[in-house]
Structure formats: C-alpha cells, structure tokens
Amino acid sequence: MLRMFNTSLVASKLMWVIFTGMLAPTLYMVHCNSTLLLEWNLFSISSTPMMMTIILDPLGLMFSCTVVMISANILKFSTIYMKEDKFINRFTVLVLLFVLSMNMLIFFPHLIILLLGWDGLGIVSFILVIYYQNPKSLAAGMITALTNRIGDVMLLLAIAWTLNQGHWNILHMWAVDENMYQALVIIIAAMTKSAQMPFSSWLPAAMAAPTPVSALVHSSTLVTAGVFLLIRFYNFLSSVWWFTTFLLFVAVSTTLMAGLSASSECDMKKIIALSTLSQLGMMMAAMGLGMAHMAFFHMVTHAMFKALLFVCAGSFIHSHMHSQDLRWMGNLTKQMPTTTSCLIMANLALCGFPFMSGFYSKDMIVEASLYYPHNSLMINLILFAVGLTAFYSTRFTMCVVLSPNNCGPYMHLEESNSLTSPMLLLASMSVISGSALTWILPLKQEMMMIPLDQKLKTLMLVTLGALMSWFFLTTTNMTKTCLYIRHPIINYFSCTMWFLVPLSSQFMMKLPMYVSHNYLKLTDQSWLELLGGQGINNVSSKASNIYLASLKSTPMNYLMMSSMLLLVATLVAI
C-alpha cells in the first residue's frame, strides 16, 4: 500500500507518461499544420443534431501538453509541500480532476460538452480554494464561486442563442448582426473566468488555496480558460464591430490596475497573482489588437515562468512555516541558492528580458502595437504597464535576495530534490520555450519594420522600471518602504484593486447588513421585547405581587376586607 505522501508522486509519473505519449503527435500536427476533427452523431432534437465532437489541432494539442507537463511538475512539488497534510489523496484527485476539466475545455468544440469542462473548472476550483476550511478560505471560495457562476450563466445563454443556428459547434458560427448578444455573453463569460475588470477581485482571494493549486490555476488552467475560449471563438467574435475596441479597453484597464496593485502588495502569493492578472490583460490586449495567435503564444510561454514563480514562492513559504509575508524573507541566496536563482530567472522572463521566454511573446505584442495603427492612449498605457511589471518584479526579487533576514533563528531552510527538480525543469522551459515556439509555431506574423527607438522602447521601459525599483529600495528602509506606499489613501486604493474588492463583495452586503442590524436593535431587541415577552413578564409580575400582597393574613387586611364586604352589602340592600 502506498504511503499517503507518495500519492502525488504516482500522479506525477502518470502525467509524465501522458505527456510523453502526447509529445510526438503534437509535434507532427504542428509540423503539418493540420487538424483532425472527430464527430459522432448521437441523436437529433427537432432537426438539430446532437453531436459529440473532438478536435485535435496544433493549438489544442500544444496547450494540452503544456497543462500536463506543468501538472506533472506541480504534483512532484506537492510531495514535499503537502507531505504533512492528512488528505493528500483527496488533494491529488482534485488536481487530476482539474486537469481533466481543462482538457475537456480544450478538445471539445461543442458548446454543451464544453460547458462540462467549464463548470468542472469552477466546481473543482471552489473545492480547492476552501481546502483548508478556515474563515478566510470559505470567504474566498464564496466570492470565487459566485463570480464564476456569472460566467456559467453567460455560457448557458450562449448555448440557448446558438440553437438558432441549428448546431452548437463553435467552429461553424455564423457571423451575422443578429448574433451580437451572443458575442457579448461569450465575452463576459471569458472576462469572469480570466478575472478581467470588473470581475478581478476573486483572483487574489483565490490565493487561500494551497500553493500547488495556485501554481496550476495561474499558469495553465482556470484563469487561462477565458483566454482560450476567446481564441476558439475569435473568428466569430472578430466579425462584431465593437469587439476589438471593447476588449482592448478592458484588457488595458486590467493590466494597469494589476500592475499598480502589485507594486504596493506585501503578500508573496498575491503579488504573483496580480502579475498573472497583468499578463492575462496583455493576452486580451493582443486579441484586441487583432493578434489571437500572439495571445496564444504568450499564454504558453507565460504558463512556464508563472508556474516556476509559484513553485519558488511555495519553496520559500514551506521553509518559513507557511508565512507568505515578504517581510519575513530576505538574504536567502546562501541558504536557498537554487530556489533564488530560479526565482530571478522567472522574474526576468516575466519582465521580458532579452532571450528569455517572455521576451519572444510579450515584446512582440508590444512591437506589434507600435507597428499597427491603434489608439495612442491605449498603446501608452500598455507601455506604462510594461514598466510597472519590471518595477514590482525587481522589488520582489530584491526583497528576497538583498533585504535583511527577518525570520526566526530556528527556521530550517532546505532544498530537497522534490523541490528543486520541478524548479530546474520549469526554469529550463522558461528560458528555451520562447525561442523554440517561434521555430515550430505557425505564427503568421508579418515582418514589422519599425524605427530603432521604437524597437528599443520596451527594453528601455523594463530597464527604467527596474532602476526605479532599485532606487526606491536602496534609498529607504527596505523592510518597510518597499512593501507599501506611504500615503494611506493611495495605499488603500491600490491594495483594494481600485476599490474592486469592497465594491464586488462588501458593497452588495453592507447595506442589507446595516438595515438588518438596525431592524434587530429597533424591533427584536427593543419594541417587540418591550411589548412582547418582557412587557408581559413585567405586567404579570406586578399583578402577581399585588395579588400575593392581598393574601397576607394580617388583622389590618381582615378589617379592610370586612369593611369592604359590609359596604358592598349595604349598597346592594339599598
């Protein structure tokens, strides 16, 4: 019988076997640039065929390989991180269900079957967010579930409206004006799943889940499901005249908000979550600029270094008694050299440093935005968000590497093989995946001829953001000023994600709670008590006391009673 902490190891080996079996067909399909479509006609309802459709195309196979490979590394990482957990078997099964739901979303282009994978992601994510069963996890799970249910309802509406076309196959959608509302609900569904504004507040809250789950969610499964859905529907959605403008505005707003919020956050996992939100906005912006293939390219490369970031953060958290506060970290280069090196590589890839994986995808998106004619305000905001990414990534790295060590003297900092081997594999992919994908992916990107100053603008902004972060950290107290903005209003505005956290959760319940509290004080605990139980008790007590006082056998009482009876008899006789 397997020991409990080996369950994740067995699942990790299973994922590696599946990845090895999928690798050769994926490379063949990508090389041939061909698609295999399998259809089974199950039955018909009012001349509408119910068909089970499976699509094996280069995009789906490549992304599925990415999901399986990252899952294998994260399950290997879980063997140490979740070693002391009593329910490791349940955790492993939930992670495998998560991977299964994502693959259903990838390979089934039928809207009804796709809904199974879509709902599966939402249900399993809710169970994993509340995994630790404390008040914080339960509150985070509630806002995660409710926000994702909005997307589920939108997808159900899309299924109902697609019935007008006589099928539910997303590969053959009719681009007509009457389908504008259908396009709108699909976009809203993708926005809720990928946490675009104004549905962004659930993403940092979902950090209440275990760190391996966060690594899987933010790299290649839950939050990328909305982006992948838009990529599947892109040919249909691009026919709607307002699609690109609306999506670009939402994406740029989300990227800017996430960058500003990450610059003032001190929770390690929330910083990485907000960086995920920023990169999701970059993918959406790429589709808003008309480059769905570049959005997919960035989604794959981002999955590699974001999984690496979470695994490195999980290693730090595991070594610091599960503390996520950056103020505990510092001077970890000598104690944890492999983890620190991998963290630096992941942050360089996130910033878009030359020849890292993020450089080939993110830099190309920014260059394309400068090359093609678009709204200059949106382009400048994208460039500003690129600088913010370098700012908070450098701040994160310096707080871990250069700040003084504030952890307890009895902390046991270790780097076991189960922690370092997934890091090294993901670190190698964070370096080579960008250049490798440019060789094998059919990106269909034309040669962009832009001036040298425009070409270097991204690199200059990355350098400027890193230098500004270094300047602020070295000229002030690193353990304090690097973690928050001193002005309280700006700090609250930034940490609450432009007030999205109170508006999306507390706003809807604050007024009912206030009214119900006043109702409780004014009715249940006031008038109803005075006129109800307490009032009846007081009246009955007084009447009882009067009656009991009249029954006391004293001569004066007898004299008074005799006088009263004599008076009554006299009155009656008269």
From Swiss-Prot:
Q: What is its EC number?
A: 7.1.1.2
The protein's annotated catalytic reaction(s) are: a ubiquinone + NADH + 5 H(+)(in) = a ubiquinol + NAD(+) + 4 H(+)(out)
EC class of this enzyme? translocase
Protein's GO biological process? ATP synthesis coupled electron transport; electron transport coupled proton transport
The record's InterPro entries line, in alphabetical order, gives: NADH_DH_su5_C, ND/Mrp_TM, NU5C-like, Proton_antipo_N
Main localization, broad class = mitochondrion
Q: Please give the family membership noted in the entry.
A: Belongs to the complex I subunit 5 family.
Protein name per UniProt: NADH-ubiquinone oxidoreductase chain 5
Gene source species? Lumbricus terrestris (Common earthworm)
Gene this protein is translated from: ND5
